[in-house]
Amino acid sequence: MRIGTILCFLSIFLNTTLNAQKKLEVRLLSSGTNTSLRGMSIPSEQVIWVSGSNGTIGKSVDGGTSWKWIIVPGFEKKDFRDIEAFDSSTAIAMAVDNPAYMVKTIDGGVTWKKVFERAMEGMFLDAMDFRNEKEGICIGDPVDVNGMNRRLFYIIRTFDGGETWKEAPMYHMPAAQIGEAIFSASGTNISFLTNPDFEYAFVTGGTASNLYMVGRQGKKSKVVATPLLQGKETTGTFSMATDKQKTIYCIGGDYKVPGGYFDNYSYTTDAGNKWVSPSISPPFGYRSCIRIIKDKTLVACGPTGVDFAANGQKEWRKASLESFNVCMVSKGKQVFLAGEKGKIGRLSYQ
């Protein structure tokens, strides 16, 4: 009886595990472009915007079934590494390098207007985040803003929905360490916070991988080292995600070693005082993007595949071997991904 009972429970466990694994699947969608994609925004269940190289921006209004592609006039040689959209009509795209630009459309991409331009040695924008439809922030690589040989992380802000952008006060532009920079891998290394002490945070890489938390008015800012791989130009934290419980998730690695899974993921629940890193099953390689699907359920992607964690952030499962640069989650918990050669996919996890 005892052996039979054990075998019965073992059979149930194996069947349950296999069935659970079958629920993870990435379905590729036909996009109609061959452009590298790194930016994505999902303002509703049906509306998806993506952005990429050669001035390319794409939009779907039917949940990814069909796509309309736009080459923004005058920006044919620019990389749009990030995009933020509010609906099917309004979107803001970020063109990264010197000179850096922001462009905005309010008619679904038919026309675009330049809302920001900045030329400066070393200028390179990396990521945006919006708190709501009015207030947004953008961060770039460290530059010598005032000609005093101090490399400060370049930060600009908008309070009118991206119509105008202004440089943040210099005391809100932290100084970078030698060899420290920000990666423009997926537009996800800066985020507004719900923390009462800190307004927003961003993550860095290179010779140092740090988490910077900028204090709210009257509060002190804070910088802490992350436990992620660092020390070379190609290493560090490439993406971050935050939840309402003040947890900050960091992911990255070494983009020159796409299959390397050592020191590529960690999270903190107390503003960096203590970090938790999985010792048994970390993400399966360098990852360029991490997003929260729902409470303690995460998705991450990179050149060697898509990973999924549903058990308190500590154990990751392989969802797909398909390569993607960026993943985003809709309000209805749909997960879409985009990557090289126009690849777009949707993750099924239920």
Residue map of PLM features:
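Bacterial Sec-dependent N-terminal signal peptides
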Residues: 1-25
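Residue-level hotspots at or immediately adjacent to binding/recognition sites across diverse folds
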Residues: 21-350
